[in-house]
């Protein structure tokens, strides 16, 4: 379990040799992989590199450390921010935690919390709260790529009275620089990917634990599981959740069977996990849309109930894969002028979000989408996992991540490099259908306008459009939200009652009007975004 921490720094904080200097959640990779080595590695990095220590530490983590050398507390997380770190400054001192729910409960004992208008509209627009904002005032998040410092009195852990938290940028997304041939780029991707797999799976192997590896119909989790298997990590437990007999289910099942892995499937038919609002909010603090977490929470609970928890390792995912080796952009154009709301799932409240000061400043559209949708968004989709075990994706590996983002878009767009790497190095992995295209990745593509897809994919998309309108209305989609809301009347009725029962906890009239409008008139995605806020209101402001 990724143990969380909470720390209160005030005038009562004393210098005590027994007082912990390091508070930490997550893990770093070390050669021997024992707790003593891990602790020593982190402390040595912080003593030698200070605020830049995360650039020396591989893993998924967040923490706070008192440096007696610099007389300051250092707040830090891994460069890609896979573990969030939250803080608030109150009259009685600093409150800092990796656990949003715990932090809120501690602050509630001192003062009430209110909704942050910016955080509120970010969640309704994107499905997650972004950058340094959170859903509730006065809590902030340490932004990704930054360390924070709070000055202390000389040789004391007590903060200097009236001190502020200073943030220091230590990591930026790399700019496109290297120009390699497709073959050379694929060769380097393979070296870096295998090194990342070895680090992560060796951690489980050294602890004699069974790696949990997610599988779906996509390429990202497939390559994580496949290459780990090829490298000798064959004792895997593949887990999959999807509508029964959807392509995600069928493809994942076939791969797990062919590799002779253990297999755990959880059907999502009926959408019942949409009712797990309260359980998920306890893990997320309402800072990310709840429904994506509900599947993970339920399937991990099922697996724990069937196995000894002590034998289970990390959850290995393919998180961020197709936007690292591929790209968020589908063409080779990477504009420097773009909408602040580019990448949002709902554009209903663009004006309100901009009026409340939402002004992300990234130098191009790919960086904007990678930071907001990828690092601040998709990464938050694992918050429910951390309550049970740790999680890692080989695509988080900073060497692989930086290498790929430096490659020109002509190599990465439309999965050009991704499919080349698979077909050249792992041709057997290309024998399975890719859920996104409904055909194999070796199928010839046909360009119509700016889009290039296999003919079979064009035809399937046309038929789906005529028959269902949206993929989320198709019962054979992995998570068909709109289909569930339309057909599962009992679930929809319970969610409607939940929404209406707690709506008045949004005490600001305009915000209350807007969230009701989104829930009443929105599509499935917009409805669950609205419900995520309501669940947080129930838990934190009632």
Model segments located where?
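Short alpha-helical segments and helix-capping/turn motifs at coil-helix boundaries
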Residues: 48-51, 60-61, 131-135, 294-307, ...
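ATP-dependent adenylate-handling active sites, centered on carboxylate activation for C-N bond formation
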Residues: 69-72, 89-91, 152-153, 172-432, ...
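PAPS-dependent sulfotransferase catalytic core
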Residues: 334, 428-520
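Charged substrate- and nucleic-acid-binding regions of tRNA-handling and nucleotidyl-transfer enzymes
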Residues: 526
């Amino acid at each position: 379990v990724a143990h969380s921490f909470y720390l209160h720094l005030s005038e009562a904080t004393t210098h005590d040799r027994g007082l912990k200097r390091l508070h930490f959640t997550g893990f770093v990779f070390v050669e021997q992989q024992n707790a003593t080595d891990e602790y020593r590695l982190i402390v040595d990095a912080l003593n030698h590199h200070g605020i830049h220590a995360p650039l020396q530490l591989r893993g998924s983590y967040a923490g706070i450390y008192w440096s007696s050398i610099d007389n300051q507390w250092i707040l830090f997380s891994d460069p890609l921010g896979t573990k969030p770190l939250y803080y608030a400054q109150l009259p009685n001192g600093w409150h800092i935690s990796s656990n949003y729910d715990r932090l809120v409960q501690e602050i509630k004992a001192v003062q009430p919390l209110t909704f942050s208008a910016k955080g509120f509209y970010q969640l309704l627009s994107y499905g997650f709260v972004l950058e340094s904002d959170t859903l509730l005032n006065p809590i902030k998040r340490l932004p990704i790529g930054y360390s924070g410092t709070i000055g202390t009195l000389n040789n004391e852990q007590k903060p200097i009275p009236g001190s502020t938290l200073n943030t220091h940028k230590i990591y930026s997304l790399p700019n496109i620089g290297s120009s390699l041939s497709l073959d050379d780029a694929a060769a380097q991707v393979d070296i870096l990917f295998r090194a990342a797999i070895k680090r992560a799976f060796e951690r489980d192997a050294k602890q004699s634990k069974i790696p949990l590896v997610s599988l779906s119909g996509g390429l990202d989790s497939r390559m994580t599981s496949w290459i780990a298997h090829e490298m000798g990590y064959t004792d895997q437990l593949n887990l999959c959740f999807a509508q029964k007999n959807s392509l995600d289910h069928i493809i994942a099942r076939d791969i797990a069977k062919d590799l002779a892995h253990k297999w755990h499937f959880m059907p999502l038919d009926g959408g019942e996990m949409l009712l797990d609002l309260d359980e998920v909010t306890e893990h997320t603090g309402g800072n990310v849309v709840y429904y994506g977490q509900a599947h993970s929470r339920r399937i991990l609970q099922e697996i724990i109930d069937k196995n000894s928890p002590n034998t289970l390792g990390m959850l290995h995912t393919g998180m961020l894969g197709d936007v690292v080796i591929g790209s968020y952009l589908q063409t080779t154009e990477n504009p420097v002028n773009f909408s602040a709301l580019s990448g949002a799932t709902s554009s209903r409240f663009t004006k309100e979000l901009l009026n409340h000061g939402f002004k992300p400043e990234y130098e191009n559209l790919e960086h904007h989408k990678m930071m907001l949708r990828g690092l601040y968004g998709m990464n938050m989709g694992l918050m429910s996992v951390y309550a049970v075990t740790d999680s890692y994706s080989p695509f988080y590996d900073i060497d692989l991540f930086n290498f790929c983002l430096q490659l020109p878009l002509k190599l990465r767009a439309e999965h050009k490099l991704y499919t080349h790497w698979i077909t050249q190095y792992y041709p057997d992995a290309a024998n399975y259908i890719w859920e996104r295209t409904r055909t194999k990745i070796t199928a010839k593509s046909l360009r119509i306008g700016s889009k290039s897809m296999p003919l079979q994919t064009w035809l399937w998309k046309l038929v789906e459009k005529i028959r269902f309108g949206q993929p989320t209305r198709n019962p054979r989609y992995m998570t068909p939200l709109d289909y569930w809301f339309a057909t599962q009347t009992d679930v929809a009725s319970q969610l409607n009652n939940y929404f209406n029962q707690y709506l008045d906890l949004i005490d600001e009239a305009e915000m209350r009007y807007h969230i009701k409008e989104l829930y009443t008139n929105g599509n499935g995605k917009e409805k669950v975004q609205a419900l995520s806020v309501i669940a947080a209101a129930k838990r934190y402001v009632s």
